Amino acid sequence: MIWNRKTRYTPYEQWPATKLPQLVAQARQSKWRMQHHIQPTSGLLNDPNGFSYFDGQWHLFYQVFPFGPVHGLKSWQHVTSKNLVDWHDEGLAIRPDTPYDSHGAYTGTALPIDDQLFIMYTGNVRTADWQRESYQLGAWMDTDNHIKKLSRPLIAHAPAGYTSSFRDPDLIRNDHGYYALIGAQTTTEIGAILVYFSKDLTTWTCQGELNVPANARGYMIECPNLVWIDQQPVLLFCPQGLSQATIPYQNIYPNMYLVADQLNLAQAQFTEPHALTQLDDGFDVYATQAINAPDGRALAVSWIGLPEISYPTDRENWAHCLSLVKELTLKDGHLYQNPVAAVDDLRTTAHDLVFEQQRATVAALNGSFELLLTVPADKTVTVNIADQQESGQLQVTVDANHGQVMIDRRHTGNSFAEDYGQTRQVELTAHKTIKIRLIIDVSVFECYIDNGYSVMTGRFFLNATPSRLNVQGDTTAVTGKVWEWRQSEHTGVDNNETKIK
């Protein structure tokens, strides 16, 4: 397939009827299909959208282009869950079928209001001369998952002084009404977050620009997301073009967070924003969406993928996945991330690490498993994740002497994104015990360090299913356990074809 403007934006109904079933069948045959991470049945998945709890279950949407591993004509795919682990595919929910989203239904969020779910999202439109127009749109979903779009945009254009790069509304409700944080770019190409207010979800007025520190803006801010943890505001966002002088990062675009003491939305003012911090220290996290659950917990899910990067699965006409759902907590102003408790229910058979001659091996694993490892102060060990033939490996080095964790994907057998480096490293306190929780799901890893103080996430592509784990090095007093995971009960991952309704 030659991907150009015409093929990327061909209306779905103009594709041959046989095309989508062929792509779904091709993706199902991939050795890199995951068991527990949400992934597209075909084509490209990107940003998580509309994460919410409504009508007794969790709802999550994601952007998808079903016809290829490229950023084309985007829709929202819909999945639901009772436990945040097992997801059911509800099919395509929002399609690009109006004059205001004709070239893609882009990122947005959702709020349960009475017996409906209100959705606010960005509609992408291209003019005849391919100029961008961005509309902030609204829709209502009922308890039968039927969606009715509003006939007119909620916000028809960016205010004066801002470009048409104006997208990704984050809905917030408080005692005064409704707010929306919208990613933006000034006409001088500086990233911004605009704050809008509405009393009725229909008429919206701009309250001004959120006082994000000047060195944290880049040239465009995408995917702003606000949650409260212990009554403190936490802003997650993606400042494209962020200066390396502000904070060093290796990925093409970073996903960052800011904690502040207080936030006055009416005045668009943070009080005492803390230091800008990278949300994930791995290779592939972007566009994280976070919400406050009905019980107050802050929950987040990330796109494990990056714009403008080619992945090995592109050759199979599918790309990317979402992270496991993570719970966010604060301690001493630092954001901790850990998988939600229901992830523990995936565990089945346990294997204690038994070391012989400074090495322990667990074999015959089924591709999805986790390692809990404790490395005492001044010890260094290396964890290797390999296929049965050990033709390639993902390597995790835990150095409790220098206080470092490094992940190396140079030798997996299928390299990609090499321009951005094949190793990532987290710096911790030297001469202290380090604990890691390493989750492997066929072609994705999530590594939680010191109870979620740091997280490293990424894709890796072995030549066959990961089935061997070994730990070696100075293993004196090192302890660990490997848990196999049960097979997926997801119908939202691989057991359902994309429904185009």
UniProtKB/Swiss-Prot annotation:
One Pfam family of this chain: Glyco_hydro_32C
Pathway: Glycan biosynthesis; sucrose metabolism
Disulfides per UniProt: none
SMART domains for the chain: Glyco_32 (SM00640)
Active site: D47
MF terms in GO: beta-fructofuranosidase activity
Binding site for substrate: L44, L45, N46, D47, Q63, Y106, T107, R167, D168, E222
Main enzyme class: hydrolase
Keyword Ribonucleoprotein: no
Reaction catalysis annotation: Hydrolysis of terminal non-reducing beta-D-fructofuranoside residues in beta-D-fructofuranosides
This protein's GO CC annotations: cytoplasm
Family: Belongs to the glycosyl hydrolase 32 family.
NCBIfam families: scrB_fam
Name of the protein described by the UniProt record: Sucrose-6-phosphate hydrolase
